[in-house]
């Protein structure tokens, strides 16, 4: 009886092992498929934005409506190398934009660390640049920005940290990038500008996305949207 019983046990055991291997394989395939889906764009074309509520406008890229849509105006600021930075610096570039200050003890460091992820993801991509505006330009001189860049591994000419005229920077942030969320509360130059938002700007200077610079899933979506925008411009 024992000689007959042991083979049966081995057969049952082999069937169970085979079942567990198949189950693990199926789970692995499902997980990989889930990851693949998450890396695709949400829509055929990213929306366009032109005001503080960030209501999406579904416009066909290259259309007359797109050409007449809100654009970020020209500016003249100075980066960590002491170079003058204007819109010409970003001609034919996709740009990720934010506002920060080097002495920020809280969220700015988290924002910088998340922006570093963007820098690393597109480090060798000549189409993608990063632009960070100091909201304390009287403190964040060229030398201070240079030290900050060195401290956090910011790549010169890939990621521009800029200082300049406070009024110009605040006007860009509030009137053109629409970065502050406290709608309904008028602000003037004396009111401090600070936001955790990242913005995605296309090659034609249009706002194509807004993202929480402190949120991991939002940063992941930004990376996906940058890749979608690159395909759109081909």
Regions found by a protein language model. Give the residues of each.
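Structural micro-motif
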Residues: 157-159, 170, 174-182, 192-199
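Extracytoplasmic
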Residues: 70-72, 80, 90-94, 125-128, ...
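Short active-site neighborhood of thiol/selenol oxidoreductases, capturing the structured segment around
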Residues: 73, 85-115, 130-132
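N-terminal targeting signals for export/organelle localization
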Residues: 2-74
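Hydrophobic beta-strand positions
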Residues: 76-77, 200
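Structural microenvironment flanking redox-active thiols in thiol-disulfide oxidoreductases
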Residues: 112-172
């Amino acid at each position: 009886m024992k000689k007959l019983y042991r083979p049966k046990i081995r057969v049952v055991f082999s069937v169970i092992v085979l079942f567990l291997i198949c189950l693990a394989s199926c789970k692995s395939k499902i997980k990989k498929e889930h990851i693949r889906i998450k890396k695709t764009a949400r829509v055929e074309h990213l929306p366009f934005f032109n005001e503080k509520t960030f209501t999406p406008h579904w416009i066909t890229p290259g259309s007359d409506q797109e050409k007449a849509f809100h654009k970020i105006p020209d500016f003249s600021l100075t980066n960590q190398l002491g170079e003058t930075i204007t819109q010409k610096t970003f001609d034919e570039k996709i740009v990720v934009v934010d506002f920060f200050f080097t002495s920020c003890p809280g969220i700015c460091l988290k924002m910088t660390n998340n922006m570093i992820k963007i820098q690393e993801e597109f480090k060798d991509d000549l189409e993608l640049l990063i632009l960070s505006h100091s909201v304390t330009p009287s403190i964040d001189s060229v030398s201070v920005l240079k030290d900050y860049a060195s401290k956090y591994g910011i790549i010169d000419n890939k990621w521009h940290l800029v200082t300049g005229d406070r009024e110009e920077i605040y006007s860009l942030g509030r009137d053109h990038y629409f970065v502050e969320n406290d709608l309904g509360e008028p602000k003037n130059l004396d009111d401090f500008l600070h936001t955790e938002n990242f913005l995605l700007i296309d090659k034609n200077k249009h706002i194509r996305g807004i993202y929480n610079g402190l949120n991991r899933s939002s940063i992941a979506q930004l990376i996906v949207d940058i890749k979608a925008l690159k395909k759109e411009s081909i």
